[in-house]
């Protein structure tokens, strides 16, 4: 079982001029609060917060508004481009986050961040709108929010729940068109706040707690006086393995931190697991798809060497590399560590590096309000639990990939992972694990194989090249050239 929950908050605040009192937009009403509009939706987007402030821009340039009409159902080509764009955005975003993080493990939802940015794009104009599209690798005008909205509303029922809410300062003048599109596309609508910080904080944090089923509490500790608008979205993913792991087979085993040190972890095990997996060459990276129900997968991306960084690995992973619905499942012995990850991130610096610094200096958001607004905060929090039942959470190139001839797949070294939607191949969550048990004291490796390698060596020796077991230092090579399926990235 996999359980993942994510929260993103985008804040806009006043830099000059008076600030008004706070009020929220939401798909779910909070106790004791009245929404501005009466229709409610129960769509839950990953919690995201954008804070906006008032800012004086001086003379306004001529507006360049996006066309207001988009197809209600995207074409197959538009859907494919969306999936490719989301993979490219995921690579850009996670590479930068990993560069500056000091955590041994990371998890975030690129879908949540993209939803928040596309929500903001509903009110963006001119260069600000172009910048948002460029960073999201989309050239679809105002149709980007529609594409993302159509995607998440058509995810498998019972697997993904999305919630959105807008908080506005009381009396803040917001445009009706922005409110209407926010509600229609994201299920978000305004609900008045009291203007009392303690009470408003409690209400916001209670909504976050309910939207993430109690996994994210006390998300906000304060509301700056300059804040006039908050955009929040929350995603809850509860994925059950299509083939469950037997808890009685879970046992302590070694996870190799590097060539010298290991930590003890709870390792789930299955003797014959339906796995789609292959070896990507140059550099050698193993990729395995563990299927969930409802067309989702937990995708492990594990280099066969220790000295790697996230940017280096992701540079070799295009959408075509990961998304291979024609790849056949093979009965495989697997070992997979149980995980419990939690991450809180401030994304202002990361988004600025991606090319959105304008959001935090002088954006054109007159599609939201004639007031001068600036984004002052972007906060994101995600949690993930991986257990026997499943997961809960919160240029043209030619690539050669080899179906590995081994009948075992052991996740016992640092790896990246994705939660992927398998129908079109959109990444919902992404993360990296370098130490699944950071509270444990690392130990020097013993001068012997780990228990899992001994077991594999005894039972499957005929399947290994030269009789070697698949250990941390083994370089894999296929037996025959015809075993290599050839894949090319789209131009």
Swiss-Prot record:
Alphabetized PANTHER family for the sequence: ALPHA-2-ANTIPLASMIN (PTHR11461:SF20), SERINE PROTEASE INHIBITOR, SERPIN (PTHR11461)
One GO process term, biological-process aspect: collagen fibril organization
Site entry (Cleavage), positions: 39-40
Modified residues (Sulfotyrosine): 484
Glycosylation site list: 126, 295, 309, 316
Signal sequence coordinates: 1-27
Tissue specificity of this protein: Expressed by the liver and secreted in plasma.
Residues cleaved off as propeptide: 28-39
Subcellular location: Secreted
GO molecular function: protease binding; protein homodimerization activity; serine-type endopeptidase inhibitor activity
Spans traversing the lipid bilayer: none
Site residues by UniProt (Reactive bond for plasmin): 403-404
Parts forming coiled coils: none
Keywords in alphabetical order: Acute phase, Disulfide bond, Glycoprotein, Protease inhibitor, Secreted, Serine protease inhibitor, Signal, Sulfation
Site positions (Reactive bond for chymotrypsin): 404-405
Stretch list, region Disordered: 439-491
InterPro entries: Alpha2AP_serpin_dom, Serpin_CS, Serpin_dom, Serpin_fam, Serpin_sf, Serpin_sf_1, Serpin_sf_2
Subunit description: Forms protease inhibiting heterodimer with TMPRSS7.
Cellular compartments per GO CC: cell surface; collagen-containing extracellular matrix; fibrinogen complex
Family label: Belongs to the serpin family.
Disulfide pairings: 70-143
The record's account of how the chain is modified after translation: Proteolytically cleaved at Pro-35 by both the prolyl endopeptidase FAP form and antiplasmin-cleaving enzyme FAP soluble form to generate mature alpha-2-antiplasmin.
Protein name: Alpha-2-antiplasmin
Function text: Serine protease inhibitor. The major targets of this inhibitor are plasmin and trypsin, but it also inactivates matriptase-3/TMPRSS7 and chymotrypsin.
């Amino acid at each position: 079982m996999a359980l993942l929950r994510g929260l993103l908050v985008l804040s806009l605040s006043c830099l000059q001029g008076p600030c008004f009192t706070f009020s929220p937009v939401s798909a779910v009403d909070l106790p004791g609060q009245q929404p501005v509009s009466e229709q409610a939706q129960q769509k839950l987007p990953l919690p995201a917060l954008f804070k906006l402030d008032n800012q004086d821009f001086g003379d306004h340039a001529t507006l360049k508004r996006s066309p207001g009409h988009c197809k209600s159902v995207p074409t197959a080509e538009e859907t494919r481009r969306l999936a490719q764009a989301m993979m490219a955005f995921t690579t850009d975003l996670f590479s930068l986050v990993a560069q500056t993080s000091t955590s041994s493990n990371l998890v975030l939802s690129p879908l949540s961040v993209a939803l928040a940015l596309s929500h903001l794009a509903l009110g963006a104009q001119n260069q600000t709108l172009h910048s948002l599209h460029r960073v999201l690798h989309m050239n679809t005008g105002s149709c980007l929010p529609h594409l993302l909205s159509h995607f998440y509303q058509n995810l498998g029922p019972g697997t993904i729940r999305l919630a959105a809410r807008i908080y506005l300062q009381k009396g803040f003048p917001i445009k009706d068109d922005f409110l209407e599109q926010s509600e229609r596309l994201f299920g978000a609508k305004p609900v008045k706040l009291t203007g009392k910080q303690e009470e408003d904080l409690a209400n916001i944090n209670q909504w976050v707690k309910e939207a993430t089923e109690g996994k994210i509490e006390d998300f906000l500790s304060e509301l700056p006086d300059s804040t006039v608008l908050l955009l929040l979205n929350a995603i809850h993913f509860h994925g059950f393995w299509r083939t469950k792991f037997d808890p009685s087979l879970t046992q302590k085993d070694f996870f190799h931190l590097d060539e010298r040190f290991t930590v003890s972890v709870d390792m789930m095990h299955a003797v014959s697991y339906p796995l789609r997996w292959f070896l990507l060459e140059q550099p050698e990276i193993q990729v395995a798809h563990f299927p969930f129900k409802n067309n989702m997968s937990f995708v492990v991306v594990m280099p066969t060497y220790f000295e790697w960084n996230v940017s280096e690995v992701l540079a070799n992973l295009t959408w075509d590399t990961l998304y291979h619905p024609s790849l056949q499942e093979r009965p495989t012995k697997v070992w997979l560590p149980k995980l419990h990850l939690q991450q809180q991130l401030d994304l202002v610096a990361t988004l600025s590096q991606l090319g959105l610094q304008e959001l935090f200096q002088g954006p054109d958001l007159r599609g939201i309000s004639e007031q001068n607004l600036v984004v002052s905060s972007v906060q994101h929090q995600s949690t993930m639990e991986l257990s026997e039942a499943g997961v809960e959470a919160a240029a043209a190139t030619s690539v050669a990939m080899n179906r590995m001839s081994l009948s075992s797949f052991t996740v016992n070294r640092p790896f990246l992972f994705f939660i992927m939607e398998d129908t079109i191949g959109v990444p919902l969550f992404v993360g990296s694990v370098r130490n699944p048990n950071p509270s444990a004291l690392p130990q020097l490796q013993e001068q012997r194989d780990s228990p899992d390698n001994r077991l594999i060596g005894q039972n499957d020796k005929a399947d290994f090249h030269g009789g070697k077991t698949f250990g941390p230092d083994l370089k894999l090579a296929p037996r025959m050239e015809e075993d290599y399926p050839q894949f090319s990235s789209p131009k």
